[in-house]
Amino acid sequence: MPLELDLQVASAAPDLPSEAQFRAWCELALRQRPESELTIRLVDEAEGLELNSTYRHKDYATNVLSFPADVPDELLDIPLLGDLVICAPVVAREALEQRKPLQAHWAHLVIHGCLHLLGYDHIDDAEAEEMETLERELLAELGHPDPYACDDEEPPSKEK
């Protein structure tokens, strides 16, 4: 059974990726769990700010929030990984500020969020290195550049 993706568009931002692009990025990141279900919700800054404030106590809209599901796999037909909330205006602004191709930045954040749903994290240096290495490898498969190549420090709105 393939990936079950629920794409919710609650953003008026221009130049959003297609559902097919989101699906391809998720399938790449979730190769180890191809039979999975997740929701991606695209939001504007007001909703992104509200969610980041409520769940992370941060007073700004971040690029991606991940909400892993807490339902045992054996209770479901398809394992529910969780939800990703992506703030479209933040993604566009970051791509411009960081001089990254917009589609490459979208791909990176979707892959990054999916890896969080799989349990990867970047709280300590060793975990960050493992997660970032995997992100680089997956993005390279798509022909996208290393998203961390120009980073002097941790990106300011990277989501846990």
From Swiss-Prot:
Molecular functions per Gene Ontology? metalloendopeptidase activity; RNA endonuclease activity; zinc ion binding
Q: What is its EC number?
A: 3.1.-.-
Subcellular location(s) of the protein:
Cytoplasm
Record's GO cellular component terms: cytoplasm
Q: Which domain of life is it from?
A: Bacteria
Location, primary (coarse class): cytoplasm
Q: What does this protein do?
A: Single strand-specific metallo-endoribonuclease involved in late-stage 70S ribosome quality control and in maturation of the 3' terminus of the 16S rRNA.
Q: Which HAMAP family match?
A: Endoribonucl_YbeY
What's the protein name? Answer: Endoribonuclease YbeY
Organism annotation: Pseudomonas aeruginosa (strain ATCC 15692 / DSM 22644 / CIP 104116 / JCM 14847 / LMG 12228 / 1C / PRS 101 / PAO1)
The gene from which this protein is expressed is ybeY
